[in-house]
Amino acid sequence: MPARTERPGAGAGSSAPCWLSPEEVGETAAWIASLQLRDGMVPWYRGGHADPWNHVEAAMALACAGRWAEVGRAFDWLAAKQHEDGSWCTGYVLGGVVEPRRDPNACAYVATGLWWCTGLGGGRSLLEEFWPMVERALHWCLLQQRPGGEIVWSVDPDGVRGTFALLAATSSFQLSLRCAAEAATELRQGPSPWLEAAERATAAVARGCRAVDRLFAGQRGSDGASSEGRASDGRASDGRASDGRASGGRASDGAWPGSDPREWAAVFAPKDRWAMDWYYPVLTGALAGEEARRRVADRWQEFIEPGLGVRCVSDRYWVTAAETAEFAMAAWRAGFATEAAELLDWTRHLRHPSGAYWTGCAHPECVRFPGGQLSTYSAAAVVIADHVLSRRSPAAGVFSGPGEVAAASEEA
């Protein structure tokens, strides 16, 4: 394992041990289940709210432990809350809505969750029961995909779309579409339009990553953003706003960006400081091969806190369990197996005796932040990462690379 002041080297080996024992996986899943409300909703933390993406993530972790009753209740909750147009609100509490906007990426993630659970043992019956719900969600999501392939970050209740896209969200979106294509094939339906839309989203992510790298490589300041290419208000140096609008008024959702890398860099909101923008293109397979390895290596020093985990934000000494677990999967997918194994092991210091996980801690004092919070999405991310790196089932292929995803249902 290279020192964290260095870039990672090639990982050794193609398999890995199980970092969590079956008993530990069971403890963590039991803790997540203990927070599930009577209507099936899984909140972020006890007394907190829920959103569709993290709710699905919790269901995926419950499936890892074979808690199918709770998995079924989680999907039942989604079916009950789905709007007629196929979308969900962004924030829920028991009996109500706290954030009425829609997040297309979160709405699409039900496809990833259902395909994951199918491969873990939910089988064809689970897939058939909830596939209509997934289809409705994705039909709505495709309406939010812009001509360049990226997906808008939000839609207001009255249908007004957000003016910019997020790199991490579009990366996750294309993975969900690919999972939907695999599910459709399993059900002997055609994979289109899901696969075609996924290809467009993947191309948008790749172009966005390359454009930012070309424009701002070597120019990032201590905050992880370009010190020259973007002003403090998030505008590119040519006057292009971070919502993708050119200074002349041409919106990026009205036409496909041209070959100028400045246009593609402006398509996505500038979130360079956030770890998710760094690793999600790799985690979800939007970038692969040498390009993925290079992306992982290039910003390793900015985000890795030696022996502790991954910083949520590059210029803040806050290490989080979810980002560390997710990045471990991204590093694994990029071929850094040894480094990925060690990264996942670092989440141990955030594990609670109950099997829960602290959301994160601020260093150097190691203060639990925020507010000593134990979060279901953090626990779920660690369980899922353990499942992927240890290849406990064919479902691991969802996050470990093409060719394995299609096998996810064969042993169900």
What label would you give each PLM region?
Residues 2-18, 56-70, 109-126, 172-189, ...:
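Well-ordered alpha-helical scaffold segments within catalytic/enzyme domains
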Residues 1-53, 64-88, 141-149, 206, ...:
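Low-complexity, Ser/Thr/Pro/Gly-enriched N-terminal "stalk/linker" regions
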Residues 287, 313-323, 329-412:
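CBM-like carbohydrate-recognition segments
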Residues 19-20, 51, 129-155, 162-175, ...:
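Extended ligand-binding clefts on enzyme/binding-domain cores
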Residues 88-100, 152-165, 304-306, 362-368:
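Acidic/His metal-coordination segments adjacent to aromatic residues that form catalytic metal sites
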Residues 22-33, 59, 68-79, 108-118, ...:
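Hydrophobic core segments within long, regular secondary-structure runs in both alpha-
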Residues 222-252:
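Long, intrinsically disordered low-complexity tandem-repeat segments
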Residues 51-55, 59-146, 167-170, 344, ...:
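Aromatic-rich carbohydrate-recognition surfaces in CAZymes
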